Curated annotation (Swiss-Prot):
N-palmitoyl cysteine lipid modification positions: C19
Annotated membrane topology: Lipid-anchor
GO biological process: cell adhesion
Cellular localisation: Cell outer membrane
Organism lineage string: Bacteria, Pseudomonadati, Pseudomonadota, Betaproteobacteria, Neisseriales
Main location: membrane
Listed name of the protein: Adhesin MafA 1/4
Sorted UniProt keywords: Cell adhesion, Cell outer membrane, Lipoprotein, Membrane, Palmitate, Signal, Virulence
Similarity annotation: Belongs to the MafA family.
Record lipid sites (S-diacylglycerol cysteine): C19
Organism: Neisseria gonorrhoeae (strain ATCC 700825 / FA 1090)
PROSITE patterns tied to this protein: PROKAR_LIPOPROTEIN
Keyword Nuclease tagged: no
Signal peptide per UniProt: 1-18
GO cellular component: cell outer membrane
Length: 320
C-alpha cells in the first residue's frame, strides 16, 4: 500500500522539480539593467511626459528647467522560495525480522588411570566457545520512505543607495524635449525664451515585490515616474500653467504555483497615485482668502494617506 502511494509522489517530484523559469529582477540601477527593467522605466517616463497638458504654451518659446530626484541604487532578495527537493527527505523505516543460527564444535576426551590393580576410565564431552558456523536469515521485506515540505519564508532583502545616474536624467530630459517638439512648442536657450517651464521629477525608480501564499506565488517589478510641472510668463510673471502632477506606473509580473512556472507573465501600465505633497494649492502671499496660509495639513490631494498626530503637532510647533 505504501509503495503504491510513494510511486506517484516520487514521480511527480521528479517531473515537477525541473519545471521552472528564473528571470532575474534586480532593483533600479546597481549594474547593467536587463531588458524588462529598461522597458518598465522607459514606459513609465514616457507615459508621464506624454500626459503633460501643454496647450497653454502653443506658439511660445520656452526654456526648460528639469530637476530629478536621485534614482540609482542596487538591491537583492535572497531565499524565500519553496525547496522542492525537500519533498524526499525525512524517513520512515520498516525493518525485517532477522534470525541468526550458530554451530559450535564439540570434542570428546577420554582418560584412563591405573592404581594398585585398579583401572579407571573417564570420558568427557566439551564444546568450544567459538562458533564454527554462523548463518543469518531475514524474514519479511524492508522499506524506507519520506514526505515533507520546506518553506523558505519571505527571504532577506539588502539594498544599497548610490549617486544619481546622469544617463537617466539625460534620457528623461530628451523625452521632455521630444514631446515639446511634437506638440509644436519651441525649446530654446534661456536667453531667447519668453516662458520658463519647471519640471520636478520626484519619483523615478522601481519597486520589487515577492508574494508567497503557499500554492500561489508571484514576482512583481514596478517602475514609477511622478513629476510636477508649471510654466511662468517671463514678461508679467504670471502662471501660464499652474502646478500639475503626472504619475504613472508600469508593472511586470510572473505568476507561479508552488514556485513552478511561471504559468503566466503579464505587463501593463496605468496611472498611479500622485505625490504625497504637491504645490497646486500654493498662492502668493496676500492672494489667499483664509485666515492662515495654506499648509501641509490641508493637503488632501493624496487620498489614502494621512498625517499622524505627532507629525501635525510638530508642524504646528515649528519643529522639523
Amino acid at each position: 500500500m505504501r509503495a503504491r502511494l510513494l510511486i506517484p509522489i516520487l514521480f511527480s517530484v521528479f517531473i515537477l522539480s525541473a519545471c521552472g523559469t528564473l528571470t532575474g529582477i534586480p532593483s533600479h540601477g546597481g549594474g547593467k539593467r536587463f531588458a524588462v527593467e529598461q522597458e518598465l522605466v522607459a514606459a513609465s517616463a514616457r507615459a508621464a511626459v506624454k500626459d503633460m497638458d501643454l496647450q497653454a504654451l502653443h506658439g511660445r518659446k520656452v526654456a526648460l528647467y528639469i530637476a530629478t530626484m536621485g534614482d540609482q541604487g542596487s538591491g537583492s532578495l535572497t531565499g524565500g522560495r519553496y525547496s522542492i527537493d525537500a519533498l524526499i527527505r525525512g524517513e520512515y523505516i520498516n525493518s525485517p525480522a532477522v534470525r541468526t543460527d550458530y554451530t559450535y564444535p564439540r570434542y570428546e576426551t577420554t582418560a584412563e588411570t591405573t592404581s594398585g590393580g585398579l583401572t579407571g576410565l573417564t570420558t568427557s564431552l566439551s564444546t568450544l566457545n567459538a562458533p564454527a558456523l554462523s548463518r543469518t536469515q531475514s524474514d519479511g521485506s524492508g522499506s524506507r520512505s519520506s514526505l515533507g515540505l520546506n518553506i523558505g519564508g519571505m527571504g532577506d532583502y539588502r539594498n544599497e543607495t548610490l549617486t544619481t545616474n546622469p544617463r537617466d536624467t539625460a534620457f528623461l530630459s530628451h523625452l521632455v524635449q521630444t514631446v515639446f517638439f511634437l506638440r509644436g512648442i519651441d525649446v530654446v536657450s534661456p536667453a531667447n525664451a519668453d516662458t520658463d517651464v519647471f519640471i520636478n521629477i520626484d519619483v523615478f525608480g522601481t519597486i520589487r515585490n515577492r508574494t508567497e501564499m503557499h500554492l500561489y506565488n508571484a514576482e512583481t517589478l514596478k517602475a514609477q515616474t511622478k513629476l510636477e510641472y508649471f510654466a511662468v510668463d517671463r514678461t508679467n510673471k504670471k502662471l501660464l500653467i499652474k502646478p500639475k502632477t503626472n504619475a504613472f506606473e508600469a508593472a511586470y509580473k510572473e505568476n507561479y504555483a508552488l514556485w513552478m512556472g511561471p504559468y503566466k507573465v503579464s505587463k501593463g501600465i496605468k496611472p498611479t497615485e500622485g505625490l504625497m505633497v504637491d504645490f497646486s494649492d500654493i498662492q502668493p502671499y496676500g492672494n489667499h482668502t483664509g485666515n492662515s496660509a495654506p499648509s501641509v495639513e490641508a493637503d488632501n490631494s493624496h487620498e489614502g494617506y494621512g498625517y499622524s498626530d505627532e507629525a501635525v503637532r510638530q508642524h504646528r510647533q515649528g519643529q522639523p
